[in-house]
């Protein structure tokens, strides 16, 4: 057992985000890649898969850390006065690292299927988000709104009276709701680690038939969630 509380928390954030990305990017891979049994299962399957992925990531890590699994959540909790500012950057680094390794394991798990899939854009979409219509300002606004809902919802849950152990399920339902209602514009990163970590994995791994990692867009799923998370926390702070 680690004696350093921060080190244990960082391990929890790393492992929880790893599980989140393994299961979340895993469902996108299953729906997208040629010859996958789940191919063409559709958007609802993806949104459900991401909701379950968040729930499992939180359950897997909450005994070690607060299970933020998301730099925008860590920032929002700090803005709300519920988390030390000094921990925001270390948490974010652990979360991004977990995202990189999660992307790596998804690549290994589906290894034969990359060669069977020729669409480079679809392959990138397994690892990273991208807009339905590329208009950076509006893509940014979409990420702000989605993450605002996420962080405000998470903070509101802290005032709710949920039975012990149910919070991860409620969080997963919130993720599903955001995905179904707000995710169609950008693929709802709502989490810089969810996008940047696997995007790095896409960039460095020898994935068959891959193309560019679209770094020109990558600032949107980083900046949008951070702004949205901070705004959600600010609104929470001014409410009684």
Curated annotation (Swiss-Prot):
Transmembrane segments: 11-31, 41-61, 88-108, 137-157, 162-182, 219-239
Intrachain S-S bonds: none
Lineage summary: Bacteria, Bacillati, Bacillota, Bacilli, Lactobacillales
Role, per record: Transporter that facilitates the transmembrane diffusion of water, dihydroxyacetone, glycerol and H(2)O(2). Is not permeable to urea and D/L-lactic acid.
Pfam family, one: MIP
PROSITE patterns: MIP (PS00221)
Parts forming coiled coils: none
Family membership: Belongs to the MIP/aquaporin (TC 1.A.8) family.
Name this protein carries in UniProt: Glycerol uptake facilitator protein 3
Chief location bin: membrane
Species of provenance: Lactiplantibacillus plantarum (strain ATCC BAA-793 / NCIMB 8826 / WCFS1) (Lactobacillus plantarum)
Record PANTHER family: AQUAPORIN OR AQUAGLYCEROPORIN RELATED, AQUAPORIN-9
Location relative to the cell: Cell membrane
Motif (NPA 1): 70-72
Keywords, sorted A to Z: Cell membrane, Membrane, Transmembrane, Transmembrane helix, Transport
Cellular component per GO, a single term: plasma membrane
Membrane protein topology class: Multi-pass membrane protein
Span of the annotated motif NPA 2: 191-193
GO molecular function: glycerol channel activity
The gene coding this protein: glpF3
Record has Transmembrane as a keyword: yes
Keyword Zinc appears in the UniProt entry: no
